[in-house]
Amino acid sequence: TVPAGRPVLFELARGDWKASFVRLARPGYGGKAAWLMAEVRLPEAVDWPHGPAQYSVDGLPVGAGTFALSGDHEDMFFGRDSRVTVDMKQDLRQSGSKGFVGKRQTRDWKWTIEVTNSHTQPVAVRVEDPEPQIGDSAIEVKVVAKPAPVVKDHVNTWNLTVPASGKSVIDYTVEASAPEDMHFIYGR
């Protein structure tokens, strides 16, 4: 029996879930934060209703929010990891031209993305940045990055293992050119 007028909690399930923890960073949007994310994979699909949840990492509370799960996988976010920072510095932003016949205008950008880990253990960090978008076939774009990103769904993704109390660096260059008489948006 359930008493009227009082909230009651029911345990829906109990179990150990396989999860890979990664810090997700998107420095091109102006932030230096890395967000702790668990990629949860369940042995079978479930369909649980929305409800309040409290989240903890290593036994420490990191936040509260609404939880729901439908399917056999979910990406769960646990808030910002203050011990992992990402700094995207623009080293070069210039325009110019090249060629005598069929002259083209050029744009060059170069960034250094530095990921710093203050944890005493190595951490997995996923850095994401939008792939340059070409709006006209006359525009040519070349991306050079070390390490090279994985490109999927117009997103450049770098999966790094950042050493304990250490740093990892991404060198990222975009070179673009277009016909001299074309309106060419500079971008960021």
Pin down the residues of each PLM region.
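Intrinsically disordered, low-complexity Ser/Thr/Pro/Gly-rich interaction regions
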Residues: 1-112, 121-137, 147-150, 158, ...
